[in-house]
Amino acid sequence: EGGSIHVDGDGTLMTTEQCLLHPNRNPELDQEEIEQLLREHLNVHNIIWLGEGLMDDETDGHVDNLACFIKPGAVMALISSDPEDENYNVLQDNLLRLKHAKDARERSLEIITVEQPEARWKEDERLAQSYINFYLPNKGIVMPAFNDPVHDNQAREIFEKVFPDREIIQLDAQEIVMGGGGIHCITQQQPKAFVIS
C-alpha cells in the first residue's frame, strides 16, 4: 500500500487521517500509536497529516492522489479552483494543512500546486483522477493524462518547470483510474541502496 504514505528521504512523512486512521486498516491503533510505529520502522521524525482524500477514492484517501514530496522541503499538491467542485473543500483543507506544516528540519514547505483534471464519472462514482499520482524513475517522470487537453497541458508545463532535467512521459491513465488507482499505484519504487561503511 505504497500510496498511503509519502516520505521525503530526509525524515518527514506525509499521510492522511482518512487512510491510516480508517478502522478498515488500523482498528486497534490511534494516531499516536501509528505515529510511533512509523517513526520506529521508517526512521522518520516528523509526520504531516492531511485530512480526507478525493471523492469516491477506493483507497480510503491515499496521499499519493493529493500531495507528494518532490524534494526535501518541497511538496506538489492537487488543488481545485472551482468552489462548486466536490473535491474543493477537501483540497483546500489539505492545502491549508501543508501551508502550516514543517518538515523534519523545521522548514516551512515550498508548495507547488497543480489543478485537478475535469471530473469524469463511471456510472454514479466520480473517478479519483490526479496528476499527483505519478512515477519518478531515474532521470524521468511518468505522469498521467486524462483526455483533458487544457489541464493535461497545464500539468505537464508545471512538471517541466519542476523537473527540468528529467524526461517526461505523459500516459493516458483513464483505464488505470477506472480500475481504482493511478500510475504511482501500479508501480513499485526501488529505494536507493544504503551502504554501511
Name each model feature, range by range.
Residues E1-S197:
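The feature marks the mature, well-folded catalytic cores of soluble enzymes
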